[in-house]
Amino acid sequence: MMDLFKFFSKDNGTSKKVAKERLKLVLVHDRTNCSPRFLEMLKEDIIKVISDYVEIDEVGLEIKLTTTKRDFDEQSVPALVANIPIKKMKERSR
């Protein structure tokens, strides 16, 4: 019976955490003057360059703008994070 009450109770802050992360993302995009179109163009360029060296899973590719803390002063700064699934390495002769 107790599990039934848990089911209908609040989600222990999960929604709050998601909302906070979304707000952070909106603020980063606003502060860096970065539009969704810019991120899409950046993604296309990254795909072009990386595709010369590896075969990638473009569907699983994720690029986002976030914040990180600098090592030397712990100040938050914008960071470009790319998750690029690699299918296989390409053979290249030099």
From Swiss-Prot:
Alphabetical UniProt keywords: Cell cycle, Cell division
InterPro entries given in the database record: MinE (IPR005527), MinE_sf (IPR036707)
Gene3D superfamilies: Cell division topological specificity factor MinE
Stored SUPFAM superfamilies: Cell division protein MinE topological specificity domain
Pfam families hit by this protein: MinE
Signal peptide segment: none
GO BP, sorted A to Z: cell division; regulation of division septum assembly
Family statement: Belongs to the MinE family.
Its job: Prevents the cell division inhibition by proteins MinC and MinD at internal division sites while permitting inhibition at polar sites. This ensures cell division at the proper site by restricting the formation of a division septum at the midpoint of the long axis of the cell.
HAMAP family: MinE (MF_00262)
Protein name (Swiss-Prot/TrEMBL): Cell division topological specificity factor
Organism, scientific name: Alkaliphilus metalliredigens (strain QYMF)
